[in-house]
């Protein structure tokens, strides 16, 4: 009888909260605006929704906003009403059914303010995920119950690890044909090395998905009423009790291995209370030693409310995450300063700009406040440029809608207008403290395309679009190639550049034509090469004199996208004021290699000695000496071309396995693994990007349209000798070198 009463009370309280939600919807969102600014730090969560493409991130976010009363009705990503999901505010996102830009919002659940950033899943927009995770305290890693751990899931996992972001795993799409949450859990453990276990089990999968079993509270949860808003709590079904006991025991064992306090209880063989398990889940999740796994289907409105409870119960508040700033001292190591997350405003404001966007009222800069308080009318300083900015307007964001606020505190995510900055800049109210926060990791572009406006009259709009997009997106580069007289854009993939081309037409009325994709090769040294170069010029009056001696050598393979400059000079043969000139000359020459005209990378320049003239030496002379020294190394050194290698994942029916493997091998792919399940197989391979163009149409034709693939950048690696010869020959022909050699032979 007591169990039935508990269930009825649970139902009653949940239905009352649903009525409260309806009330909030009818009264506008005043409750969200009213309380969002004034919560204690324990009542705040900053989370991201991240996953591989098409795992259901945006649909899940839409359900979260609906159940928390933030929106009045739900819309589908590819819905028949053509409205699109709330967080996909860009017209292109709604048309293509994919998320292109990360979008921020905030909502309330059980008196807790949850700031949410919904991120793209496509590898071409990976920088959006990168900068979102940089400023978040926790994340929900969404996995498809059919696809499981896929290539972009692994990328997101690496990004979470880089920024030490705790996460919950949510296995979505239980309603899909072929869903297998047990297989996804085993992939979480084997492919991603997560100490993971279920805290929920599905009651049926595919079309039989009825609800879920809560292993912590040992009860069944059913989602009833319109849109699954009413939760009915019941006893665990008879046929699932054995499995539930086994999975609960597995959860307890995983927790006891990860948490010392819980492990002691386990060894003492004491019974565990619900509070014991919840406390251990929270401790281990925050320390990233355990990953709780939840289940559901956002599209069918099952599992979202328990996920919201788990976000509050297990993910950290801003006060439980250590955020650091650094003070640079010349000639010394950086000094680490732990920022104070208290929302009392006693310490100076510290914030990090993580995203720029051109809004209707000018440039919109997204920031996370890490310390102190910021109010309208305050002055803040950019730690990189030391420029002062007066705060005229503070806004909080709900997708593409803005809500003005008067102040923001530590832990808040907000936006400013009219701030000239770059992604990763630190802002503070006290410029004298010389503190800055760690910036955002930005991957190098791997694909280039020629671009030109279709009409010459659109050149002004074209320039405006390029200026805006290159500022917003640090992975989108633009430059003019003087040799071929072409304007080039480079980015993370073909889709990345196609999206920007379409945005130029839609947002600036400037249709453009894209050329064929070009791979961003690199050139590097094979072995060390010494140089001793004297630059001497006398043409009346003061001349130029500079001598530099040193060594250029390759960096380790894991650093082959970097350039290093090391000053090893002792004494005054090369005066210290001229060393920056040498470095500038070195970096300028690295913009264009000798073999293929691509950038140099993976090289360390060691300046060891030299000579100067008391009158004729200058920074310019030493810069030109560096130019000459590198030309000398071009002639005397041994060089090779590096190419981007992609991690490729192909899934197709088993009968096409031979054809798929054959095509990957033909494209110089190295198979790294295969797996099969229920008539389908997945093959993992490393393939040069240069060999992947046109693969989509080949895969479609060879698998009768049933195969699909994803790829993401892995690393740069040396080209095969015949590929290098071909690249060098093509470059020489484009420069007219081949023709000149033929003429010499004829003569």
UniProtKB/Swiss-Prot annotation:
GO terms for molecular function: GTP binding; GTPase activity; translation elongation factor activity. GTP binds at residues 51-58, 118-122, 172-175. Pathway: Protein biosynthesis; polypeptide chain elongation. SMART domains: EFG_C, EFG_IV. Residues 1-16 form a transit peptide. GO terms for biological process: mitochondrial translational elongation. Belongs to the TRAFAC class translation factor GTPase superfamily. Classic translation factor GTPase family. EF-G/EF-2 subfamily. Mitochondrial GTPase that catalyzes the GTP-dependent ribosomal translocation step during translation elongation. During this step, the ribosome changes from the pre-translocational (PRE) to the post-translocational (POST) state as the newly formed A-site-bound peptidyl-tRNA and P-site-bound deacylated tRNA move to the P and E sites, respectively. Catalyzes the coordinated movement of the two tRNA molecules, the mRNA and conformational changes in the ribosome. This is Elongation factor G, mitochondrial. It comes from Drosophila grimshawi (Hawaiian fruit fly).
